[in-house]
Design a protein with these regions (language model features):
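N-terminal amphipathic/basic-hydrophobic helices that include classical n-h-c signal peptides
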Residues: 1-16
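Acetyl-CoA-dependent GNAT
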Residues: 10, 20, 24-30, 35-113, ...
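Terminal substrate-recognition subdomain of acyl/acetyltransferases
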Residues: 13, 177-188
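Short Asp/Glu-rich motifs
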Residues: 76, 150, 173-174
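A generic "structured core" feature
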Residues: 115-117, 125, 144, 148-151, ...
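Conserved catalytic-core motifs of GNAT/GCN5-like acyltransferases
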Residues: 140-143, 155, 160-179
């Protein structure tokens, strides 16, 4: 049985009174997750990757149908965590255990207009809480060296580079790499 991360509620975000909730995704969130992840992927990789590669990744990984299946938390994946404000998904992320004591952040994206508000940190905290409850002592994430949005975010939260590997979905001879970042987690 997966541990349910607690729901965090915040008011007074930015200038107005808004209600922000961090929670496990529900089937009704699939379209919003797809929208946020597609927008985040495009914003992150525009000018770094070819437009056709960007759209191919979005079509494969961020299609609402796929996300609906993933909300059910298949083996190795703990399900999606969402940031919802006024019934709108504004951020989403998820991870899973890759081996005993070792967790991975597989995805974390926000509406690009909402970066810098602490929402990504809240999603990461919820994923981390979920993984610690499952016994994680290490937390890993793959980030491409050109990802000038993701790298500073993870460095600021204690992740350090521990190597590199071929970028997900590419062959080693293509030369595309992802940095492997890790931070140690305190047991619960």
């Amino acid at each position: 049985m997966l541990a349910q991360p607690r729901a965090f509620t915040f008011a007074n975000i930015e200038a107005g009174m808004r209600n922000l909730v961090i929670r496990r995704a529900e089937t009704r969130d699939a379209e919003g997750i797809a929208r946020v992840c597609a927008a985040g992927w495009r914003d992150t990789y525009r000018g770094i990757k070819e437009p056709d590669r960007i759209e191919a990744v979005i079509a494969e990984y961020y299609a609402p149908e796929r996300i609906r299946r993933e909300i059910a938390a298949p083996e190795g994946w703990d399900g999606w965590i969402v940031a919802v404000e006024e019934e709108t998904v504004i951020g989403a992320g998820g991870g899973g255990m890759t081996e005993p004591g070792v967790a991975e952040i597989f995805v974390l994206y926000l509406d690009p207009t909402r970066r810098g508000e602490g929402i990504g940190t809240l999603i990461l905290d919820a994923i981390t809480e979920q993984q610690r409850a499952r016994g994680a002592r290490e937390q890993w994430v793959s980030v491409e060296p050109e990802n000038t949005k993701g790298l500073p975010f993870y460095y600021a939260r204690g992740f350090e580079v521990h190597g590199q590997r071929p970028e997900w979905g590419t062959a080693p001879e293509e030369g595309h790499v992802s940095l492997r970042l890790m931070r140690r987690l305190q047991p619960q």
